[in-house]
Amino acid sequence: ANDIRPLRDFEDEEAQEFHQAAVQAFFLYVAVAFVAHLPV
């Protein structure tokens, strides 16, 4: 009856890794967009 873990445990484990990956992808996207808009 305890199939679902508390949300706090989920955030402490999977969400932390996902957050790191999302932040890295976001900054990579921003860097690519910034470079793409620089005058050549």
From Swiss-Prot:
<comment type="subunit">
    <text>The core complex is formed by different alpha and beta chains, binding bacteriochlorophyll molecules, and arranged most probably in tetrameric structures disposed around the reaction center. The non-pigmented gamma chains may constitute additional components.</text>
</comment>
<dbReference type="InterPro" id="IPR023624">
    <property type="entry name" value="Antenna_beta_dom_sf"/>
</dbReference>
<keyword id="KW-0479">Metal-binding</keyword>
<keyword id="KW-0076">Bacteriochlorophyll</keyword>
<keyword id="KW-0997">Cell inner membrane</keyword>
<comment type="similarity">
    <text>Belongs to the antenna complex beta subunit family.</text>
</comment>
<keyword id="KW-1003">Cell membrane</keyword>
<keyword id="KW-0042">Antenna complex</keyword>
<dbReference type="GO" id="GO:0042314">
    <property type="term" value="F:bacteriochlorophyll binding"/>
</dbReference>
<keyword id="KW-0472">Membrane</keyword>
<keyword id="KW-0148">Chlorophyll</keyword>
<dbReference type="GO" id="GO:0046872">
    <property type="term" value="F:metal ion binding"/>
</dbReference>
<keyword id="KW-0437">Light-harvesting polypeptide</keyword>
<keyword id="KW-0812">Transmembrane</keyword>
<feature type="topological domain" description="Cytoplasmic">
    <location>
        <begin position="1"/>
        <end position="20"/>
    </location>
</feature>
<dbReference type="GO" id="GO:0005886">
    <property type="term" value="C:plasma membrane"/>
</dbReference>
<protein>
    <recommendedName>
        <fullName>Light-harvesting protein B800/830/1020 beta-1 chain</fullName>
    </recommendedName>
</protein>
<feature type="binding site" description="axial binding residue">
    <location>
        <position position="19"/>
    </location>
    <ligand>
        <name>a bacteriochlorophyll</name>
    </ligand>
</feature>
<feature type="binding site" description="axial binding residue">
    <location>
        <position position="37"/>
    </location>
    <ligand>
        <name>a bacteriochlorophyll</name>
    </ligand>
</feature>
<dbReference type="GO" id="GO:0030076">
    <property type="term" value="C:light-harvesting complex"/>
</dbReference>
<keyword id="KW-1133">Transmembrane helix</keyword>
<feature type="transmembrane region" description="Helical">
    <location>
        <begin position="21"/>
        <end position="40"/>
    </location>
</feature>
<keyword id="KW-0157">Chromophore</keyword>
<dbReference type="InterPro" id="IPR035889">
    <property type="entry name" value="Light-harvesting_complex"/>
</dbReference>
<keyword id="KW-0460">Magnesium</keyword>
<comment type="function">
    <text>Antenna complexes are light-harvesting systems, which transfer the excitation energy to the reaction centers.</text>
</comment>
